[in-house]
Amino acid sequence: MRNKHEYSVIDGGKAFRFTEGRLNHTLHQTARDTLTALGHAVKETVIEEGYDKDAEVEKWLWMDAVVWQMPGWWMGEPWTVKKYIDEVFTAGVGENKLVANDGRHRVNPTEGYGTGGLLHGKKHMISSTWNAPIEAFTREGDFFEGAGVDGVYLHFHKANEFLGTTRLPSFICNDVIKNPQVERYLADYRAHLEKVFGRG
């Protein structure tokens, strides 16, 4: 993606039990600051600080792409991120802004499911943090059976794609508790953002 664009960055970091959410907050801030430095317009949402669902719908209409930042909890996103999706996406359906319908037609009700989104041309990207090593995602016979990071997040991609967006390359930080390498994570993430989004 090149030339100046408008991006929404959503921080799904969450303080809970033994985690304070600091790494995810830092990665979110890195995305915000890097995209701004590249010359793009950026709006941010920190889910833990609260949000107005109607204002969030307007951000989805405004943006060219959204960057989701979140930890991997129990093989998926935190409940606060799912709550955001349920509230904001549903608000956009009710107002016929994000989704018109489920894409099917009475003439052929078995075809076209998931094609009724109104955000065609927009994109989404996942940035996540996991204590699992990358091999747990990619290696055949390992925990995720070779599904890969995007395979584990298929449901999340599909929630976004139901709106009409298409996916950008995902980013993941691994071993974040067992062997944290924060400076490397941040350097790798900046490089990833620069490669995916480019300078405005």
Task: Describe each region flagged by the PLM.
Residues 34-39, 116, 122, 159-168:
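A structural motif corresponding to the C-terminal end of an alpha-helix
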Residues 2-3, 24, 137-138, 142-200:
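Glycine-rich phosphate/pyrophosphate-binding loop and the adjoining helix
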Residues 16-17, 51, 133, 179:
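Flexible, glycine-rich phosphate/dinucleotide-binding loops
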Residues 54-156:
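Helix-loop-strand module that forms the ligand-binding subsite of alpha/beta enzymes
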Residues 50-58, 178-185:
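Structural motif
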Residues 2-38:
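N-terminal beta1-alpha1 ligand-phosphate binding loop
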Residues 8-10, 43-45, 67, 125-127, ...:
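Hydrophobic/aromatic beta-strand patches that form the interior of the parallel beta-sheet core
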Residues 38-51, 171-174:
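A short beta-strand-loop structural module common to alpha/beta enzyme folds
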